[in-house]
Amino acid sequence: MSKVLILKSSILGGYSQSAVLIDHLASHWETQGAAITVRDLGGKDVLPMVDGEIASGLRGGAELSARQQEMLALSDTLVAELKANDTIVIAAPMYNFTIPTQLKNWIDFIARAGVTFTYTETGPKGLVEGKRAVLVTTRGGAHKDGPTDHVVPYLKTVLGFIGITNVEVVYAEALNMGPEAHDKGMSEAKHSIEQLKA
């Protein structure tokens, strides 16, 4: 049985197009027997903003404040959740040409030297290996493979840095460029999702 972690990151609630696609993917994969865990980073599972105190605490140490200990424990939970699943599905709507703050927060909690990556004499090495990632990205305009897409290249870089290099991408583009373009973008994305195996 494939174990899947789904990360939602939209802050738009019922208006979220990425949530529609993620729910479609979850339903499709559940019929294939996948065990799915959902973390709604833009909703009920929103994470604290990583500030200087938290960032310092995530490096560990003997003299951590109560808040730092709590945030380190949260980070450990998120990392364990990441490592426990075979496939990581990331909903990545484009907000102002990049990913939502809520998703960046998750990255800041799990990207830890000595835990999810390490530095060697030949450069960095990811420690989260043998995983697959699926990015589901929605955007109001058309940005795929262009200089204004700072979503997919960034996420591929981060995932590769921690060891996840098997990355598939589902695009839903031009969603704000009129009803016809919206329907076409969503239809093509749903079709792409239906071709994916859990």
From Swiss-Prot:
Gene3D superfamilies assigned: 3.40.50.360
Keyword Transferase: no
Pfam assignment, any one: Flavodoxin_2
Residues noted as binding FMN in the record, renumbered to the chain: S10, S16, Q17, S18, M94, Y95, N96, F97, T138, R139, G140, G141
Cofactor note: Binds 1 FMN per subunit.
Broad EC category: oxidoreductase
Swiss-Prot/TrEMBL catalytic activity: 2 a quinone + NADH + H(+) = 2 a 1,4-benzosemiquinone + NAD(+); N,N-dimethyl-1,4-phenylenediamine + anthranilate + 2 NAD(+) = 2-(4-dimethylaminophenyl)diazenylbenzoate + 2 NADH + 2 H(+)
GO molecular function, one term: oxidoreductase activity, acting on NAD(P)H as acceptor
Superkingdom of origin: Bacteria
EC number: 1.6.5.-, 1.7.1.17
Cofactor: FMN
Keyword vocabulary terms for this entry: Flavoprotein, FMN, NAD, Oxidoreductase
Record carries keyword Transport: no
Subunit structure: Homodimer.
HAMAP family: Azoreductase_type1
Function summary: Quinone reductase that provides resistance to thiol-specific stress caused by electrophilic quinones.
Family: Belongs to the azoreductase type 1 family.
Name the record gives this protein: FMN-dependent NADH:quinone oxidoreductase
Protein source organism: Shewanella baltica (strain OS155 / ATCC BAA-1091)
Gene name as annotated: azoR
